Amino acid sequence: MNSLLMITACLFLIGTVWAKEGYLVNKSTGCKYGCLLLGKNEGCDKECKAKNQGGSYGYCYAFGCWCEGLPESTPTYPLPNKSCSKK
């Protein structure tokens, strides 16, 4: 029983350590989600935890929403072959 518990705990930690992180990106413009209040930011946290993003935590870093615990399928900035176009 203890072995099963240890294996489960290790798998959980591996998943947490290897989770993707990065700036949230707007797929249509290729730009980062912007923010002004650096550090703990309710807007960034909400965006990161949204169903379509799947992150575990978000905050404002260098005026962009940085997310942790993202699934590999969630795109992050910069997008390949797409530069930020502010139109």
Curated annotation (Swiss-Prot):
<keyword id="KW-0528">Neurotoxin</keyword>
<feature type="disulfide bond">
    <location>
        <begin position="35"/>
        <end position="60"/>
    </location>
</feature>
<feature type="disulfide bond">
    <location>
        <begin position="44"/>
        <end position="65"/>
    </location>
</feature>
<dbReference type="GO" id="GO:0019871">
    <property type="term" value="F:sodium channel inhibitor activity"/>
</dbReference>
<keyword id="KW-1015">Disulfide bond</keyword>
<dbReference type="InterPro" id="IPR044062">
    <property type="entry name" value="LCN-type_CS_alpha_beta_dom"/>
</dbReference>
<feature type="disulfide bond">
    <location>
        <begin position="31"/>
        <end position="84"/>
    </location>
</feature>
<dbReference type="InterPro" id="IPR003614">
    <property type="entry name" value="Scorpion_toxin-like"/>
</dbReference>
<keyword id="KW-0732">Signal</keyword>
<dbReference type="InterPro" id="IPR018218">
    <property type="entry name" value="Scorpion_toxinL"/>
</dbReference>
<dbReference type="GO" id="GO:0090729">
    <property type="term" value="F:toxin activity"/>
</dbReference>
<dbReference type="GO" id="GO:0005576">
    <property type="term" value="C:extracellular region"/>
</dbReference>
<feature type="signal peptide">
    <location>
        <begin position="1"/>
        <end position="19"/>
    </location>
</feature>
<keyword id="KW-0165">Cleavage on pair of basic residues</keyword>
<feature type="disulfide bond">
    <location>
        <begin position="48"/>
        <end position="67"/>
    </location>
</feature>
<feature type="domain" description="LCN-type CS-alpha/beta">
    <location>
        <begin position="20"/>
        <end position="85"/>
    </location>
</feature>
<dbReference type="GO" id="GO:0006952">
    <property type="term" value="P:defense response"/>
</dbReference>
<dbReference type="Pfam" id="PF00537">
    <property type="entry name" value="Toxin_3"/>
</dbReference>
<comment type="function">
    <text>Beta toxins bind voltage-independently at site-4 of sodium channels (Nav) and shift the voltage of activation toward more negative potentials thereby affecting sodium channel activation and promoting spontaneous and repetitive firing. This toxin is lethal to crustaceans (freshwater crayfish (Cambarellus montezumae spp.)), it provokes a reversible paralysis to insects (crickets (Achaeta spp.)), but is not toxic to mice. At high concentrations, it does displace the (beta) mammal-specific toxin Cn2 from rat brain synaptosomes.</text>
</comment>
<keyword id="KW-0872">Ion channel impairing toxin</keyword>
<dbReference type="InterPro" id="IPR002061">
    <property type="entry name" value="Scorpion_toxinL/defensin"/>
</dbReference>
<keyword id="KW-0964">Secreted</keyword>
<keyword id="KW-0738">Voltage-gated sodium channel impairing toxin</keyword>
<protein>
    <recommendedName>
        <fullName>Beta-toxin Cn5</fullName>
    </recommendedName>
</protein>
<keyword id="KW-0800">Toxin</keyword>
<comment type="similarity">
    <text>Belongs to the long (4 C-C) scorpion toxin superfamily. Sodium channel inhibitor family. Beta subfamily.</text>
</comment>
<dbReference type="InterPro" id="IPR036574">
    <property type="entry name" value="Scorpion_toxin-like_sf"/>
</dbReference>
